[in-house]
């Protein structure tokens, strides 16, 4: 399946061009690393693909059935809400059930836990909850009632990574996962787990990273952005 076509893309800040006349195509199952010197516009290009910035020239076509999931270097949260509510923000019966189950478990509320278990059974939500617990555990995310605004920089990155992985695992069959420096603030064990997870999940991936070992382990193509 053809996911993305980019033709003649250009972007500048002031009089200085970040990049010009970029053309590429992404197919389902591609795992691509984007490399360039600092300041060449890698992060900007990723944001354009995700619809968070606009190009000054060229076109971006994304298949109507493809959802773009962007993991950014500076994640944005609802600062006053809990980690739990930031991760499980979808209004969907399965997500609502898992959110209620995780909240009851985190707070040790036996009555709410019983009700939540019944709802999880009704919706067949246990398989996805198992995946959620694996992601949270591997990324060392345990205090789900903590507010997002109280998280350290490293915690914010790990919560954002968990949120991204849970999103792509839950809702969409056809996802282009765009990741901007995902291994920053991860220890060696977490990086190895993320490498295994991305390979196991067979995602379509566009990656920016300075971690050459991670890049070689996960990606099958390397594109160089001139600038």
Predicted features, each with a name:
Residues 1-227:
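ABC ATP-binding cassette signature C-motif
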